[in-house]
């Protein structure tokens, strides 16, 4: 039998496979109708494991057993997605516990940020809410999350990611711990400046203060001043405030231009951070389960079983529903060695059918899924 004949036989088999697949999906559709009527869950892990064991047993060698399992995992995954889609169309998913609003009520809002006046968080707050907003600052990110949870603030402004230094891992952990939700974001271009008392010459400086990340981002500039002592503080604005209050010309701070204005300091040198394209993304957080009706990004977190292929199957919900995943991060789960929680950003709105479909599948098949916000 030549190659052409062999390919012809494969084509005939493939036609039968496709016909059987469509027949199977029609029965899956009927299963979905039954589950809509009875309220039975789509995902039945025990049933699927039993089915896969039977499929493996039908094969004649280990290679085919592995391949058959992969094939039927995909078939059953598509069956579930069909069922989720029918549940969405039938309105059986219920609405998400978030209320859509035309705009955020910010006129009388109280906003909290971590740091001090002149910090980048302060600037992000002013850009998002306006300079006349009622605001106060706290020492830690946890304090900010507590303020909105307890009601002393309506919104918090928190840095979640820097384009050069990466994520602010503490913020991710706090989003899991607190029942607070993301409703907006603000991106601020970062330009670190060397600040000193008015009239100070750079040659007078002996000590420079700043946040550890800012010192790291300015490493190239600082390397040209090896005799300077570098001291880390928890916020750039605190560094500027310290230099201003102590009145010592041998001290300088690395912070933004807004900190110089806030504390009456002189900019001794601009752009001391080596990366020109350096930005920080800030999130706007509230304790209300709301989202803007024109929101276009969704953030969630979830855990997956510690087994082969589990993350792959979870991510397939984004592919099937044609949702663009823009970010995925992992964080270790406390007290569970080598297990991770995944944070995912993707494009969409809670009102979209594809989003509802994906979220239902993720809720059923992942562990401890939490919606962090639509903004």
Q: Residues of each region from the PLM?
A:
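Domain-level signature for soluble enzymes in the chorismate/prephenate branch of the shikimate pathway
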Residues: 1-375
